[in-house]
Regions:
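A short beta-loop-alpha structural element at the N-terminal edge
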Residues: 1-14
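Helix-loop element at the rim of GNAT/NAT acetyltransferase active sites that forms part
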Residues: 11, 15-28, 65
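Active-site rim helix/loop that mediates acceptor-substrate recognition in acyltransferases
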Residues: 25-48, 58
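Conserved beta-strand in the GNAT
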Residues: 46, 52-61, 76, 81
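Conserved acetyl-CoA binding element of GNAT-fold acetyltransferases
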Residues: 70-84, 139
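Conserved acetyl-CoA-binding loop-helix of GNAT-fold acetyltransferases
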Residues: 82, 88-101, 124, 128
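Conserved active-site alpha-helix within GNAT-family acetyltransferase domains
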Residues: 93, 105, 117-136
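Conserved GNAT acetyl-CoA-binding A-motif
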Residues: 96, 103-115
Length: 144
């Protein structure tokens, strides 16, 4: 398995993988990944089994407050996806390590992430990866 930093030419591939995570049309996601792959404030990584992409991670700098942290900016894991056939084989862990290494390389001393309250698999992964749960939040909205 190979993990490498993505470049703008990888944007269609990133968009395909991300569409499985966020249930969005890859065509809508692709321009965003073009921007992310050239931004000094973000990084995307791809995992390959041979020549087949099997996962991705997106991380970026957050300058606003991140729960449980005391510095700024903070590296933040924005998205992580591994194809089902390759899950529980260390792929996600290696992708997160690549993001953490990137965050360190741009001067971060803290790294954050989040997950949905009902995503037990993500919670278990985060805890096993060394993250500590620091808060639980339910957001509300109403039309005016």
């Amino acid at each position: 398995m190979l993990i490498r930093k993505a470049s703008p030419v990888d944007s269609p591939l990133l968009a395909q993988l991300a569409s499985r995570l966020w249930a969005q049309d890859p065509a809508e996601l692709e321009p965003e990944f073009v921007n992310l792959t050239v931004s000094p404030e973000a990084a995307c990584f791809l995992a390959f089994d041979g020549v087949v992409a099997i996962g991705f991670a997106q991380c970026q700098l957050r300058h606003d407050y991140v729960e449980g942290t005391s510095t700024s900016p903070v590296g933040f894991l924005e998205g992580l996806w591994v194809e089902e056939a390759h899950q529980r084989q260390g792929v996600a862990t290696q992708l997160v390590h690549a993001c953490e290494d990137w965050a360190r390389s741009v001067g971060c001393t803290e790294f954050g992430s989040d997950c949905e309250l009902d995503n037990g698999a993500s919670l278990a992964f985060h805890l096993a990866s060394g993250f500590e749960e620091v808060n639980r939040t339910i957001w509300f909205a109403k039309k005016l």
